[in-house]
Amino acid sequence: MNLKKIICWPPLLAGIGAGITIAILGYITYESFLSSTDYGLWLIASFGSTVVVVFGYPSNEFAQPKNVFFGHLLTTLVGIIFVTFFEISFISIGLAVGIATMLMIAFKVTHPPAGGNPIAVMIGGVSFPFLVFPIMAGAITIIIGGIIY
């Protein structure tokens, strides 16, 4: 068995890159000096799907930095607007996801993992600071990891 072939196997490298990036976000969220501050949340569930796209399919349009950053930013903003101005219901959650999807496609920043952000935002009842931590900070961390990869 060729060791170089095993070490350079793309799925292995993608898994390592994804795992390290999520571990970094997890460390910042749970172990770093930021963890007990308002800046401590750097990890959300949709980032798990994001690293699959970024590290597993780096040449895909959905994995490009612009799509990762603005896809997460846009969908989270839609969720925050909905949770701020509308009562949470199956209708408002569905509308938020639909509008977020429409906007990602219209602005050419589609990033499918970000489609879940309005759901998480509305269920969690978060507000505008959520756009910075974890969304922008986490997306930038993933983008940097993807560039290094």
Could you describe each region identified by the protein language model?
Residues 1, 102-104, 122, 136:
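Detector for methionine-enriched segments
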Residues 110-111, 115-131:
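Membrane-helix boundary connector in multi-pass membrane proteins
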